[in-house]
C-alpha cells in the first residue's frame, strides 16, 4: 500500500463532498463540503485543501448508471476531474462510485439524521465511501484503483 494522504471527491451539481485518508491510506473520514461554483472557485478551494493536507492523490467518484453506461453526471465528473488535475498538480484518478450517495443516505437515515438538514453531510459521506472503497481496492490488489486522469490539452 502506498503511503500519503489521499482526498476523496464526490462531484455534485450543487455541492462537492470531500473526504481524506490517514497518512497510511487505511481509513477515510469526512472532511468538508465545498459549494459548486460556475467558475474555478470550487477547484481553488480543493487545491487549498490539497496543499494544507499534503495530499498525494485525489480520487474522484465516477457516477455511472447501474448498467455501467455513462450519463450526464459521468461527463460532468470527468470534466471536473480533468480541470482539477490542471488546477492542483496532484495525480487524480476516477473510480466507479455507483450507489455511493444511496449508501450515504441510508447510513445517515440509520443514524437518525433527517434528509433535508443532512444534505451537506451526505456529500461528505458519499466522498468518504468513494475514498474508502478505493483504499480497500488498492489494499486488496496492490494496484492503484480506477484510472488516471490526464490533463486535457486544447478545446
UniProtKB/Swiss-Prot annotation:
InterPro entries: RNaseH-like_sf, YqgF, YqgF/RNaseH-like_dom, YqgF/RNaseH-like_dom_sf. The keyword Cytoplasm applies. CDD domains: YqgF (cd16964). Pfam families: RuvX. SMART domains: YqgFc (SM00732). Its main location: cytoplasm. One of its GO terms (cellular component) is cytosol. Keywords: Cytoplasm, Hydrolase, Nuclease, Ribosome biogenesis. One of its GO terms (molecular function) is nuclease activity. Could be a nuclease involved in processing of the 5'-end of pre-16S rRNA. This is Putative pre-16S rRNA nuclease.
Amino acid at each position: 500500500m502506498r503511503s500519503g494522504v489521499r482526498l476523496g471527491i464526490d462531484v455534485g451539481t450543487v455541492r462537492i463532498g470531500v473526504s481524506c485518508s490517514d497518512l497510511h491510506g487505511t481509513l477515510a473520514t469526512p472532511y468538508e463540503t465545498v459549494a459548486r461554483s460556475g467558475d474555478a472557485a470550487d477547484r481553488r478551494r480543493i487545491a487549498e485543501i490539497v496543499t494544507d493536507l499534503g495530499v498525494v492523490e485525489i480520487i474522484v467518484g465516477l457516477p455511472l448508471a447501474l448498467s455501467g453506461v455513462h450519463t450526464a453526471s459521468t461527463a460532468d465528473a470527468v470534466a471536473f476531474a480533468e480541470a482539477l488535475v490542471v488546477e492542483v498538480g496532484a495525480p487524480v484518478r476516477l473510480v466507479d462510485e455507483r450507489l455511493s450517495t444511496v449508501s450515504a443516505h441510508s447510513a445517515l437515515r440509520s443514524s437518525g439524521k433527517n434528509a433535508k438538514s443532512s444534505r451537506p453531510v451526505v456529500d461528505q459521506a458519499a466522498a468518504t465511501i468513494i475514498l474508502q472503497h478505493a483504499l480497500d481496492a488498492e489494499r486488496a490488489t496492490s494496484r492503484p484503483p480506477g484510472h488516471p486522469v490526464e490533463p486535457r490539452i486544447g478545446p
